[in-house]
Amino acid sequence: MDERRSSIFSTNIPCRNEQLYGRCPYIDKGCFFQHKNQDNAPASSKPPSATAIDPQNSGFSTKLSINSPSFTPLKLSKTSISSASNKESVPLTRPKSYSSALSSGKNGAAAQQAANSPKTVSLMTSSSKAANALQTHKSSLARAASAVPFSPSKATTVSLKESASLTSLSNNKSVSNLNSISGASSPSGSLVNLHSLTRSASFVPQPSVPNSGQLSNADMSRHILARFPPFFHNLNEQQQKTTSFFLADDHLKWFTYLTQEFYQFANIPKLPSHVLSYHSLIPRRMIVTVLPVLRYATSIYKVIDGNNGLPYSFVQLRDFTLLNDRNITNVSPWTKVDSPHVIKIREAFTTHAFEQKSIVFVYNYLPSCPSLYDLFFASPVFRKRTSSFYFSQPLKATKEVLWCFASQLISALYSIHSSGLAAKMVSLKNVLMVGKMRLAIFGLGIMDVIQEESTEPLTSLQRNDCRDVGLILLALATDTENVTLSTAKAHLTRLKTIVSTDASLVELIEVLIFNEELRIQTLLPTMLSYMVNNYESVLLMEDVYETYLAEQVENDRLLRLLLKLEFLDDRPEYVDDPDWSASGVYFVIRLFRKYMFQVQTIDDASKKPTLQSTTTPPRKLLNKAHLLSCLNKLDAGTDEQILLEDEFTRIIMSFKEVKTTINTAFMELERRCSNNLSVKK
């Protein structure tokens, strides 16, 4: 017979046919359940190797009833009985509760006699201590199984999934060691003998912990005040110096300035209301003209694209006539240049919207960033003004600064030359500092449109770009504004006489200016170490910005909770709503809001916050930490109990219950708004 259809534990279960009808018609046909006249049963029904079981430990506390369904038992498997007899037999103490429960039934005398007889039981473990614990804690699986109609073909085994579901239905408690038992009692681990589970000493139901399942999965870091330690605490002195090299000294002031620039709007009557899809034109206040070599009157505006709502920069050349319409298509290759050191152009077009012939170049938006000329060669007042966002003191052209500028400008030229283009315009006035120690070239692509097509080869134009970068570095190193190719040798000779000058930097400037066969690709190996330093500094700065970003994420999370509470607070349609009355389900939201924003009092003697006044006039305290703690615990939905009260009501609830109530009320509000309902229906 199949092992699943036989079990030695079935021999100690009273036969229900005998209880219902007085005799069992299958007693001579191999019925392996217990009968009153067991001696009259055939030998096949009483295998000598089978051990008896104490009925008290069977775990079936349900009384026998006349309404129990009848059954048709199957034959006992000799193979399973003989294999089970080899297991260790441990005597169990006989509790009284089960025998007394059986004695109250119709067959109480027989059950009492069977309970008083000495019996042994086959167990899966030899721990007698665990067996005693089993007598105290009744098996929840057995109680669940006793409530299910009996079927002989399914009485001995149940699947792991079924046993877990039965336990959940019976007492709604979690059985944490069910998987370990299934592996011990079933070779495959997929089937569990239900009756052996109820008698196994290793299976002891654990005491139920309230919401233990939720506690194991809850994000416990969300109910505390979310704080991120300053990143600089984890850096040594050298790393702090490297990071601050690229990080603005007053970053909050810089971020505020960027936000003000972004949201700045003005209505200027002399400007057109819109140009194509661009609108909201605002002149950019530049200290000096950033495009001085164009020989045209230039105006720069901040505009908003009506198609996507993003800001862009307008460069307008006034009184310009495009002689060759095909030249405007020269902007297309520049739209494909992607480099952090090149301000990308978007498009170019001619227009009469400014009441005169003009050509407009549209670039990606950037704030009013200073140029290198503003930082090093403008008047002291302008220099202090332009560098105030990045530096606490005016910037000086030290060796580290010059190498940083050189690596960025050479990287920009490498991206441009690799695209088959030439910058044609690199000067102190169109190289902008868009961040602390971060440079970007502005206005590229304009010369390709306004100039006639040149017969000069591309390699010669690219060589001029390298020369322009060398002149910029030489001007910064010698603190000389007007450095040209004719005066470069004299300035370079004077630079070599300075003791603090880096010899490798002088060699780089000399190669950039005077080497006629120079290609930008040949300079990259010499700049590799400085580019790696810049890369490491940028990564450290990225960690700092991530710290700031994490703080703003926490602020955003708490702001959303506050907004949700404010949407639900004191709405006029809730005045006559019974759910929001003092006896309604949503009244707890009002009590919780009062609990969060309560004004605590401080006893001068103990210096501890209290909610009751003392003999002396109490000191009021706006406890913001209490507010943040409540919001974090509400977001996490913790099980911490709090007292919500007013003059007439006192309610003890957990943050989890309050969170569920708030979410339900807010979803109901959203439903009414989506259905355009003023009151709840």
UniProtKB/Swiss-Prot annotation:
What GO biological process terms are annotated to this protein in UniProt?
Answer: nuclear-transcribed mRNA poly(A) tail shortening
Record's keyword annotation contains Phosphoprotein? yes
- At what positions is Phosphoserine found? 165
Name the segments for region: Disordered: 38-58, 82-123
Q: Where is the composition biased (Low complexity)?
A: 41-50
The family database entries (Pfam families) matched by this protein are listed as: Pan3_PK (PF18101)
- Per UniProt, which keywords does this protein have? Cytoplasm, Metal-binding, Phosphoprotein, Zinc, Zinc-finger
Q: Where are the zinc fingers (C3H1-type)?
A: 9-38
What name does the UniProt record give this protein? PAB-dependent poly(A)-specific ribonuclease subunit pan3-like
